[in-house]
Amino acid sequence: MTINFESQVVLVTGGTRGLGREFSLCLGASGATVAVNSTTSDDAGVIDTITGSGGQAAHFAALVERPDSLIEAVVERFGRLDAIIHNAGFVRDKTLRKMTDEQWQEVIDVHLSAAFKLTREAWPHFEAAGGGRIVFISSASGLYGNFGQSNYAAAKMGMYGLARSISMEGGRSNITCNCVAPVGATTMNSGHWSDRDKEIRKAEYVAPLVAYLAHSSCEESGSFFETSAGSYKKLRWERTEGLNLFPADSPVTIDTIAENWQTITNFELTEHPQSMADSLQRMYVRFDD
């Protein structure tokens, strides 16, 4: 199997530096027409690198927080849009107690709100193209939390709820949406890493997974992946079988919860709900007997 992006136009936000640069280069080398976005007019040599190897690419300077003109410019230039990789973003790290409203909102806007707005603006163009692929670049901070990053963690985990909803709404139109939490060595994050760590965590190693999720042949949707150092893993929800009572027969009190805490939190027996309906059905099934 050879994955080729010929005739597919892919927009990469934040596509000139760090991980975004690797996404752009990987796509360009695989035949995609790459719409490379950044906030400034400096494309950091990405366009020349892609076109110098025979690929097609153009740079679009725009703020992703206001994406209507960006999407319009890409479609006007290339005639279509097939996929978006939303990678643009920044951090404003502070402990929650010291974080300002502005520091909170800036991070929410560039990561989560922009993901929503980009998707909304691109939707009719995806439908016109017969489908679309959306990849949100999330973070392990969203999955696990991180000290001093309550804004960033909330935005990055919010992307997953958004992706799940998009995957449901987009199913009939062949529009998919997934999240990836990558870790790769970039100038921004690797200053304190050893040379060995930088070598095994090269940013280019995470790009193939992201690119595949953006390809028209990939039907995966509503999923969350982690990748670093050549590892590629899909996540799923897991919960305990927990405590399942019949409150109508025996009232449940705060003491009931406290006395059964080990049962509620014991992961020896688990469930893996796939949707809200599945989650609730597993809670209600015992009443069907």
Task: Name these PLM-found stretches.
Residues 139:
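Residue(s) in the substrate-gating loop at a strand-loop-helix junction
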Residues 30-45:
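Conserved glycine-rich Rossmann-like NAD(P)H-binding loop of the short-chain dehydrogenase/reductase
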Residues 197-288:
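C-terminal helical subdomain
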